[in-house]
Amino acid sequence: PATGKELDMPGLDLHALHSDYDSLCRRGIGGIAAERLAFSIMHGNGNVIIVVDEALSGLLGDEVGSGLAREICESFQAIRVDGIAFVRIVTGVVQMTYYDRDGTNASMCGNALRCVTQYGVEQGYLAAREDIVMTDDGPKWVSADGGRIRVCLGTGREFQRVDADRYFVFTGVAHLVVLLGDHQDLEAVDVRTEGAALRYDDELCRRLSHSEGLHVDFMQRHAAGVRIRTYEVGVEDETRACGTGSAASAYVASRVWGVPGPVRVGVRDGEIQVEETERGLVIEGVTGHLFGTIAPPVPAPATAVQRVPSRA
């Protein structure tokens, strides 16, 4: 496995990651020899995503799916993998298909899109200045200009007030944003329990027309912007960061609390900045490699292969 691009993460045991990979190679995965998989374990502000390069792996279309994604996630015990982003190139355009760790095909993951952007630029699949990645939520504008990984999730959609302290907005996936007052303690929130109760609230899901369930963001004002903690569908637990959740929270904070943009959203691991632009909600934060089998990157092309307008 390649180790030259690894970044430090608190509590990460690289020896244990190597052991997990060795075990994976011995037993194979979904009928596929693990040595075939060209992948990088990456993270976006601590949200751990495995990027699998379908072309370098020689994967066929029917080999990629929910079962393979779930099995790959479960194969690593040294670190919780929150999801898998499969990357392919079709007629010169990079496509991303994302699965949560439970195998659910999600239309969008903001942090996965950031990881794919960094990976795509490093491998020469994407232009650094700006380019387009096709997703299940439509084409998305991405940029790694100057080393800043910025991606556009489109505009906030279906925005509505649910009740006094809860708002809904769709930012590629469905988010319920729960507002906390100054007298409340964000750190005291039992995100796993309270988040699950709202995520599985059938009446609320029907009311909002999202039977797939709701991601839940608990948000509190902060001197520098806002802070959030997120319960994610498909992980069924709190994650260290959520890109679509940061975008949803910033969208709500600007409209309900009047927080000026760009909104700084504090997450478990650092900060994600959200800016509303003509293209839509643009998120920016830390991304990096932790472990993988990908060969050293090649220079990125000077210009994009193809331009497609980003869907709002």
Residue ranges and their predicted role:
Residues 1-146, 169, 177-312:
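A glycine-rich beta-to-alpha transition motif near the start of alpha/beta enzyme domains, typified by
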Residues 152-166, 191-193, 197-200:
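Active-site glycine-rich loop that binds ribose-phosphate moieties when present
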